[in-house]
A protein has these predicted regions:
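N-terminal low-complexity, Ser/Thr- and acidic-residue-enriched intrinsically disordered segments
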Residues: 1-75
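Intrinsic disorder/low-complexity segments enriched in polar/charged and small flexible residues
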Residues: 40-43, 91, 133
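An aromatic- and histidine-rich active-site surface loop
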Residues: 130-140
Length: 140
């Protein structure tokens, strides 16, 4: 059976502090059944950009590999707050009146997607099934 690789904006790293919700509930069994990989942002704002060699955090839990990277404040603001939330979310929910497009945010959105794709590439196997989740990763 092929391994499922889920790529999402943010991953639910198991730490025992709270129960999984949202996307995690729907995919944990599928990831477990395929010895899957869940890749994305770890939710941390860091001084490093996610592009450093040593900032990829890999851990295994209950048959699932979790691979995550941090974002720096600038990338978080541009990619997540200003483009994903202020452009894509309103546009994809029929609220064009709320869209606030700024070229710098688009550049940040593309830069973070490119960085994530480059960080994921060495972790991918030829027969993996990729699931790219949600609008945060459209250029992926």
């Amino acid at each position: 059976m092929s391994r499922l690789v889920v790529v999402s904006n943010r991953i639910a790293i198991p730490d025992g502090s709270k129960s999984a919700g949202g996307l995690a509930v729907g995919i944990l069994d599928a990831l477990k059944n395929t010895s899957g990989l869940w890749f994305g942002w770890n939710g941390e704002i860091s001084e490093i950009s996610g592009e450093e060699e040593d900032d990829l955090n890999l851990m295994e839990d209950d048959g699932i590999t979790y691979a995550s990277v941090p974002l720096n404040q600038n990338d978080y603001d541009l990619y997540y707050c200003q483009f994903s939330n202020a452009v894509l979310w309103p546009a994809l929910h029929y609220r064009i009146d709320l869209v606030d497009f700024q070229r710098e945010a688009w550049d940040g959105y593309c830069r973070v997607n490119d960085m994530l794709a480059k960080r994921l590439q060495p972790l991918i196997k030829a027969d993996d099934i990729l699931w790219i989740h949600d609008y945060h990763l459209l250029p992926f």
